[in-house]
């Protein structure tokens, strides 16, 4: 599975955890709503377990892809250097490893921040859902199960909108993971090529993407 697919699985697990707790008790009653607020700690523990299960795997897959792209970028310069009969100085591979390691750590940090944001977002969504379900049931607009079914349907369509960018656009976790991975792979390929050119003493050369 790709990093984005693993994050999607994580999002699904978190939503499933919320649904499981919402379905417990006399749905929509005042006591039920109070119970849901009291279950935030339980939800947090369940979601932390889901994150521990899938986020580490997602980080590993993202780091693999990033390293692969970096080495592909370096290989393009190596091929050019062979044509020009240039030799790679000693220690160049170690420097490349350091560069790729830096990008790998940066990616892990981004994904870990994403996991923390998902936890906070799940808490807010759960509380909001319990309030909405309670209000609908008390008003007689829907039964408890109807209100939950509508809530779940909305989550299925929209996902867990946990991230907002500078333009105010909202992103699901898997979409955000794709953005992180795409951006980092583009950067690591470029920086790996620059690093290799520096090692060979090459000026900027035109490279097809």
Question: Where is each model-derived feature located?
Answer:
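N-terminal leader/targeting and assembly helices and adjacent pre-domain segments
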Residues: 1-167
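Acidic, glycine-rich two-metal-ion catalytic cores of nucleic acid-processing enzymes
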Residues: 154-157, 161-209
């Amino acid at each position: 599975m790709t990093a984005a697919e693993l994050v999607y699985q994580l999002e699904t697990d978190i939503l499933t955890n919320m649904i499981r707790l919402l379905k417990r008790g006399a749905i929509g009653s005042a006591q039920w709503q109070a119970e849901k607020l009291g279950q935030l700690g339980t939800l947090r523990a369940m979601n932390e377990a889901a994150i521990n299960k899938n986020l580490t795997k997602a980080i590993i897959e993202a780091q693999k892809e990033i390293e692969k792209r970096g080495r592909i970028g370096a290989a393009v310069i190596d091929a050019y250097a062979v044509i020009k009969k240039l030799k790679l100085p000693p220690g160049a591979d170690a420097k490349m490893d350091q560069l790729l390691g830096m990008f790998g750590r940066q990616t892990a940090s981004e994904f870990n921040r994403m996991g923390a944001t998902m936890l906070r977002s799940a808490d807010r969504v759960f509380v909001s859902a319990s309030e909405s379900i309670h209000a609908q049931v008390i008003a007689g607009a829907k039964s408890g199960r109807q209100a939950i079914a509508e809530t779940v349907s909305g989550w299925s369509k929209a996902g867990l909108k946990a991230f907002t960018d500078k333009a105010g656009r909202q992103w699901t976790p898997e979409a955000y993971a794709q953005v992180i991975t795409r951006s980092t792979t583009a950067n690591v390929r470029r920086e790996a090529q620059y690093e290799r050119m520096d090692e060979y003493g090459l000026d900027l050369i035109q490279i097809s993407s």
